[in-house]
Amino acid sequence: MDQQMALTWGLCYMALVALCWGHGVTEAEETVPLKTLQCYNDYTNHIICSWADTEDAQGLINMTLYHQLEKKQPVSCELSEELMWSECPSSHRCVPRRCVIPYTRFSITNEDYYSFRPDSDLGIQLMVPLAQNVQPPLPKNVSISSSEDRFLLEWSVSLGDAQVSWLSSKDIEFEVAYKRLQDSWEDAYSLHTSKFQVNFEPKLFLPNSIYAARVRTRLSPGSSLSGRPSRWSPEVHWDSQPGDKAQPQNLQCFFDGIQSLHCSWEVWTQTTGSVSFGLFYRPSPVAPEEKCSPVVKEPPGASVYTRYHCSLPVPEPSAHSQYTVSVKHLEQGKFIMSYNHIQMEPPTLNLTKNRDSYSLHWETQKMAYSFIEHTFQVQYKKKSDSWEDSKTENLDRAHSMDLSQLEPDTSYCARVRVKPISNYDGIWSKWSEEYTWKTDWVMPTLWIVLILVFLILTLLLILRFGCVSVYRTYRKWKEKIPNPSKSLLFQDGGKGLWPPGSMAAFATKNPALQGPQSRLLAEQQGESYAHLEDNNVSPLTIEDPNIIRVPPSGPDTTPAASSESTEQLPNVQVEGPTPNRPRKQLPSFDFNGPYLGPPQSHSLPDLPDQLGSPQVGGSLKPALPGSLEYMCLPPGGQAQLVPLSQVMGQGQAMDVQCGSSLETSGSPSVEPKENPPVELSMEEQEARDNPVTLPISSGGPEGSMMASDYVTPGDPVLTLPTGPLSTSLGPSLGLPSAQSPSLCLKLPRVPSGSPALGPPGFEDYVELPPSVSQAAKSPPGHPAPPVASSPTVIPGEPREEVGPASPHPEGLLVLQQVGDYCFLPGLGPGSLSPHSKPPSPSLCSETEDLVQDLSVKKFPYQPMPQAPAIQFFKSLKHQDYLSLPPWDNSQSGKVC
């Protein structure tokens, strides 16, 4: 009975002690692996967990992560460079780890349980007999009072109900220890007493020092109980034998003798951050194991161990007198919802360029559930900047983003990450791989403006100087074009060489030139030659050679057609055409312009070889094999070119000389009715100009020929009879009737009895007979009679080759170009004399010194002619150029 009462009081005492310890009781702390554990899944096929252990515990213990859905399964983990989703406690140095758990059974109702276990079995066990493990209660209300000669230390102890308590005042005694404050308790002084107070004499203390004392209850030596004393007010910590530091140690349990079993143990302080221990007990060997709670941790002191406490209730000490107590690793865990812990794989980032802008595109990992929506976070920056200074854009349900306001010629970097939204949650995925690109170079606006201004100014300068240069080049080019109007030789339009009166004489003496043709000739005579400077061309031409006109049989008197001056062209006697002999169409010269050009491109035969016998009827049949191609004097002829300087200024005497020359030659005069009108045109127009025809009649209607654009040798002017041909070139200076030199041609008449001439072989040349040249050599005022030694071509006899009075005995009359102008070659001061060099019958070379300077009296109404050059000239523009046609290889014996 007494023992039962003592047990009851002991339990009550233990309960009171537990209540007294309640203020220091705390729950076991979470370990570092449990604090840092975070797990996220892709909600498809795997779970990724990240946690960390302390660096101090690495050499003592190795922790393993366990995943439990139906049963616990260890998870393989590996060291990682960083702690992914949590932070390491500041009081520890962490070692991060990363675990990948293959898992596909995701559901919104699943709760995954994660825990940690050490790789070795940790724990201890103890059998506790109550009577032999009694620890008396701790003294309470310890106080000290001073007096004059002593210090009184008092305390109290509650033993509870004496009927149930195993302890009595006889079973306990007190131990008092005191020391200086800075001393250790191992060096403290102690004393034993059975009273609840003790007196300290002053001699026990050092003056001016602070002492500390503590009291504890212990079993008296005469008690039947055994155990140990109660705890000191301040606990004493001492070192134990060496051993495994990771193992918990110094497990002690003391029954208070009432109803509580107080247990304590110690853990190496460096392992307390990684491993948590708990106290487990069994009241009997067959009873289930239970966990002691709460576990109290003493504040860490100078000791290297950390002490833990836990009190076990002992409701029936007599029934359960032996407890099994153990300290084991305390397994801790927490629940994580999978659908709220999703981390997706990083997206794949690409970039496209759209004209002047750039666009980012990305693709995400395909998930098991396609209805899960995503949000994206895009960052882009200059390559030289840090990501903290980057621009960040958050986009929901988008897979592209346009980039604007990018600087040209700059390198940029971009990255993107993703996480689920809506009913699912998680964390951001890792950043995608950085995509780097460089923007195109764009010219700044200011540069464009400056370049445009520069180009405009440059273009204006180029246009300015270009126009000046082109204008100068044009003027130089134009100045290089031969333009006779710039020379004093052609200030009068060439009237000194071909006066209008001579042309009028041709028109008046030719009955065929009546009507529109005569008016046309008169108009041409009256016009000034100012048109020679541009592209205007002479409208004068001849009739079509296909129309053969026969001169009338009656007498023909031709009055002068010019009002200013008249000149009668000497009659040229020709034989009438044979009525029964057909007329052959003759080639003609092209007078379509101011220059003389041939209608065909082959050389002409010599004149003497083409002369034929006249017909019986007195008509001359010209039969030329081809048209004139060059104006050449016949080689070997005796015709001479008379210097005009010897015959200038003689007035009407030259007309008489021309007539007398013809009479003296012995050739009979030709009747006026038989004289065909003679007209020479010195202008030649290109084929594309519009010609105006001038009809030339041969006398009779049967002898009429078609008017054309050519002057043919078959015309009466250029048709040579069998008799000698007399030509007189003389100016009529001083007389109003003849103001310019005239060309006097006399065609001797062949007797009717003479045989008809064959086809002339040299009809394409104009020959000057010696009589004309001799007449020209006569001094002024004393005309010498012409020498009747002109050669006459007799049919059947070989013709003697006589050279013309040309500077070139070859007979070729070639113009000489000096600068921009053309002259008769060899024209210069002095008299013109015939060459004594023997002529070459088949070579026409360039002539030298052909014409001498002429001094002509200048009248008020017309400029003085300067030289017997070409009558008309034009500026070389457009088609008006003087060119030589190609040589005819068939006429290899002649140059012309």
From Swiss-Prot:
Residues found modified as Phosphotyrosine: Y765
Positions of short motif WSXWS motif: 428-432
A cellular component term, taken from the record's GO annotations: membrane
Membrane topology: Single-pass type I membrane protein
Compartments where located: Membrane
The keyword rRNA-binding belongs to this UniProt entry's keyword annotation: no
Span of domain Fibronectin type-III: 136-243, 343-439
Signal peptide annotation: 1-22
Record-level Gene Ontology MF annotations: cytokine receptor activity
Known glycosylation sites: N62, N141, N350
Residue positions, PTM Phosphoserine: S752, S754
GO BP: any one term: cytokine-mediated signaling pathway
Origin: domain of life: Eukaryota
Pfam families: EpoR_lig-bind (PF09067), IL3Rb_N (PF21460), Interfer-bind (PF09294)
PANTHER family xref list: CYTOKINE RECEPTOR, CYTOKINE RECEPTOR COMMON SUBUNIT BETA
Record note on domains: The WSXWS motif appears to be necessary for proper protein folding and thereby efficient intracellular transport and cell-surface receptor binding. The box 1 motif is required for JAK interaction and/or activation.
Record family assignment: Belongs to the type I cytokine receptor family. Type 4 subfamily.
Protein's name according to its UniProt entry: Cytokine receptor common subunit beta
GN (gene name): Csf2rb
